[in-house]
Regions:
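Lipid interaction determinants
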Residues: 2-6, 10, 15-141
Length: 141
């Protein structure tokens, strides 16, 4: 009887402690603005932001331009199909903000996002993995 009680207590304790030992995977932060963890590119203040909705629709705010995208996402896999970069620059940007360097960075970032294949949480950051790895954090404003 004592052995049975001890075994029962061990099983109950293991069940209670298992979630702490193996925390549940965090879900992807759908609907949140995810800000690229990078140094600002002067002269503008705009930073790339990725927003993915639960239905797979996405908006990618790049250094200068914004493009729509479709995203397929699973536990750890992700595939981003960005729309084409618009030729025209945004009207709402200040003069000189979209420098040739920023326009080139738009093209590079869009290509990097199209190449990601997996994602995961690390602390408070969402990491995207592909030929170019990227770190995004939830926007706090």
């Amino acid at each position: 009887m004592r052995h049975l009680l001890r075994t029962f207590c061990v099983v109950v304790l293991a069940v209670l402690l298992a979630p702490a030992a193996f925390p549940a995977e965090r879900a992807f932060p759908f609907g949140q603005e995810l800000l690229l963890d990078a140094q600002p590119m002067r002269p503008g203040k705009r930073m790339p932001i990725l927003t993915i909705e639960l239905n797979g629709d996405a908006k990618i705010d790049l250094w200068c331009r914004t493009v729509p995208a479709r995203v397929e996402l699973s536990e750890s896999a992700i595939r981003i199909e960005p729309g084409p970069l618009p030729q025209e620059l945004p009207e709402m940007q200040s003069a000189g903000q979209c420098t040739p360097e920023r326009i080139y960075a738009d093209e590079q970032m869009l290509a990097a996002l199209a190449g990601v294949t997996s994602w995961r949480w690390e602390d408070s950051a969402v990491l995207l993995f592909g030929p170019t790895n990227m770190t995004f954090r939830a926007a706090t404003n």
